[in-house]
From Swiss-Prot:
It comes from Hydrogenovibrio crunogenus (strain DSM 25203 / XCL-2). Belongs to the isocitrate and isopropylmalate dehydrogenases family. LeuB type 1 subfamily. The gene is leuB. It comes from the Bacteria. This is 3-isopropylmalate dehydrogenase. The record marks 141, 192 as: Important for catalysis. Transmembrane segments: none annotated. Substrate binds at residues 96, 106, 134, 224. The keyword DNA repair does not apply.
Length: 357
């Protein structure tokens, strides 16, 4: 049965890097009987320029009908002055909330060929392989009430609400425990239970869910310590699970341990493993249109899409092996290039991955 994939290139370097991932998927369609149909549409600033909103209703409808979504990146300088309600990022948030994509999976994996690219000593990061599971549709980013108000004395006050329900915590905990079971059966839950009641409850619920996974070794860590430990001794972690805001920050920190955010994929899943896949980096408007961006994170996001939503683990591994081969050949985009290696463009890197398939 043909599976429907919606391609949303977005803004900045989004169209360039997405084109390379599509190239790889097309090669798999031809050579490996990948039975998918790809449809393209707009999101973010590109959608705002055409429709006046960062996510058109018909695009959302297409997303709901798709088996998976591959997204480039959203945002850019030219939209920063817009009202917050129609900024490009709102298109991304709307997709996540409307599709109930509550689980964000961000691998921080260090390719051995790139050990020197990390700012940490090679011995600290060699063999690094962390999966951060972040709750994506609750917490302080979505809590109500929120806003900016003027008090009686004329002073302005900003306020947000940090809220999680028991069911929201349970379902993300299950995703994290399931991931841990498929990996090294180690889970670290990150909270701020010494200060925030929300995360005090988070810790209690993670412990309750843990009883269903007796084989998984569970550890709890305060977020400030977790941020420190990621730099001090990152290899102690395997799967980490945390709320929306802490996960946003920690996954970016973990990504830089690998030396290039241009290598890191991410998946956002619903309860049935339907998902949206995107690189962990942003839209990088400063290098857009120059054919120099690293497409590997997007290509690896396509691999995650094949693994989690399209049930083609064989083809996911095929892409990951091809990426590794290309790195072995010494090919690098500018962000991961160093002396003695071959610098290639965005499209050349995509072509090399296709050839390595």
């Amino acid at each position: 049965m043909t599976q429907e994939v919606l391609i949303l290139p977005g803004d900045g370097i989004g169209p360039e890097i997405t084109a390379e991932a599509v190239k790889v998927l097309e090669a798999l369609q031809q050579k490996d009987n990948l039975d998918i149909s790809m449809t393209h549409d707009l999101v973010g600033g590109a959608a705002y320029d055409q429709h006046g909103v960062p996510l058109a209703e018909e695009t959302l409808e297409k997303a709901k009908q798709s088996d998976a979504i591959l997204l480039g990146a959203v945002g850019g300088y030219q939209w920063e002055s817009l009202d917050i309600s129609v900024r490009p990022e709102k298109g991304l948030l709307a997709l996540r909330s409307n599709l109930e994509l509550f689980a964000n999976l961000r691998p921080a994996y260090l390719f051995p060929q790139l050990a020197d690219a990390s700012t940490l000593k090679p011995e600290v990061v060699a063999g690094l392989d962390i999966l951060i599971v972040r709750e994506l549709t609750g917490g302080i980013y979505f809590g109500q009430p929120r806003g900016i108000r003027t008090l009686d004395n004329g002073e302005r006050q900003g306020y947000n609400t940090y809220v999680y329900s028991e069911s929201e915590i349970k379902r993300i905990a299950h995703v994290a425990f399931d991931a841990a079971m498929k990996r090294n059966k180690k889970l670290c839950s990150v909270d701020k239970a010494n200060v925030l009641e929300v995360t005090e409850m988070w810790r209690e619920i993670v412990d309750e869910v843990a009883k269903e996974y007796p084989e998984v070794e569970v550890q709890h860590m305060y977020v400030d310590n977790a941020a420190m430990q990621l730099v001090l001794n990152p290899k102690q972690f395997d799967v980490m699970v945390t709320g929306n805001m802490f996960g946003d920050i920690l996954s970016d920190e973990a990504s830089m341990l690998t030396g290039s955010i241009g290598m890191l994929a991410s998946a956002s899943l619903d309860a049935n493993n339907k998902g949206m896949y995107e690189p962990s980096h942003g839209s990088a408007p400063d290098i857009a249109g120059q054919n120099i961006a690293n497409p590997l994170a997007t290509i690896l996001s396509a691999a995650m899409m094949l693994r989690y939503s399209l049930n083609r683990e064989d083809l996911a591994l095929k892409i990951e092996t091809a990426v590794s081969k290309v790195l072995d050949q010494g090919l690098r985009t500018g962000d991961i290039w160093s002396e003695g290696l071959t610098k290639v463009s965005t499209s050349e890197m995509g072509d090399a991955v296709v050839a390595a398939l």
